[in-house]
Amino acid sequence: MNIENYVIETASLAKSAARKMSIVSTVTKNNALNAMADALIENTNAIIEANKKDMENGREKGLTESLLDRLLLDEARIKSMAQGLRDVASLEDPIGEVIRMWRRPNNLKIGQIRVPLGVIGIIYEARPNVTVDAAALCVKSGNAVILRGGSEAINSNTTVARIISEAATKAGLPEGAINLIENPSRDAVNVMMKLNDYIDVLIPRGGAGLINAVVKNATVPVIQTGVGNCHVFVDASADLEMAANIVINAKTQRPAVCNAMESLLVHKDIADKFLPYLAEKLKPLNVEIKGCIRTQSLVEGATEATEEDWAKEYLDFKFASKVVDSLDEALDHIYKYSTKHSEVIVTNNYENSQRFLAEVDAAAVYVNASSRFTDGSEFGFGAEIGISTQKLHARGPMGLKELTSSKYIIYGEGQIR
């Protein structure tokens, strides 16, 4: 079977399953999610063996340590994935929720209720945990899902997807509710992007290249998830220790994720104290700093930041640093270079915090907290399908409700117009 026919056959199966998924009971969905969790734990060794192949291939291809970290599945991460499934099972089912209801003067009763989107296509890169997170949220929100992971994780994804799909079907979900495109070629993605008759929405998760390619070439509607050029602005009134802790966490806890800090802005009135203090704390972590002239004069070993650096998502132990003269300059810089993902101000000035919240255009805007909290589980949504940086149909961490649409139901007594 050629690639086009294979993808269309998979999409057709998903479309058939989506019709049935829309009316699957909450109990059945929860049973399926718990069965999927059990199956992951029971098959831990098989998953780790498959992942070892991907890790070996990744090292041979020269993947960075941060990307290899995203690819890794070990016993602890598999347990975390299983717990994520159970957490989603414990969340309230959004399907059938009455959003609003009212009565018209002609006595028509009109209600708006939450319904699934239908078939969701997820295109993602070297993070096999996305296979589980995406499947969990799609199942709970009554959608069928077509997963297409990156070639780097093909062995891990194939093993995990087969395990959870079989468990879900045995627990009562329709066949085709969870699907993985096992062909890692780009041709498969190109076919997916054109399947308007089968796929209701595409959600790309990955780097700028992947996301831009899907947005540019897809005819299926796309929810654009975030490339994260996230900034931390350390205001003149900031507490030095708090600011340093936030920067270190935002940059180094997991540098290869989209909510990690990539650019640091420091008010000139605090720069001569803060930047050397921060640099000393960063030394054991081997973080590379690229900076403006003033940053270079204050931080030993800092190299020159180019125009490209201000817009770069490093996904590594690197960041760009600029000393700014004012809050206005910080806001202008963020406006110019932000990808509208997550932006942070560290300040003890209430007026400045409120200006920052009001004027920064991003999915998540923080006062005195790390950008690393832009995450579905941290927001209390359970797992997330991605972090949307657009304004239609959803924005920010996308949990269950963001994977639904609505329809109107109308009760009449024979009314005609």
Curated annotation (Swiss-Prot):
GO molecular-function terms, A-Z: glutamate-5-semialdehyde dehydrogenase activity; NADP binding
Chief place where the protein resides: cytoplasm
Keywords associated with the record: Amino-acid biosynthesis, Cytoplasm, NADP, Oxidoreductase, Proline biosynthesis
Function: Catalyzes the NADPH-dependent reduction of L-glutamate 5-phosphate into L-glutamate 5-semialdehyde and phosphate. The product spontaneously undergoes cyclization to form 1-pyrroline-5-carboxylate.
NCBIfam families to which the protein is assigned, alphabetical: PRK00197.1, proA
UniProt record similarity statement: Belongs to the gamma-glutamyl phosphate reductase family.
Protein name as it appears in the record: Gamma-glutamyl phosphate reductase
Species whose genome carries this gene: Clostridium novyi (strain NT)
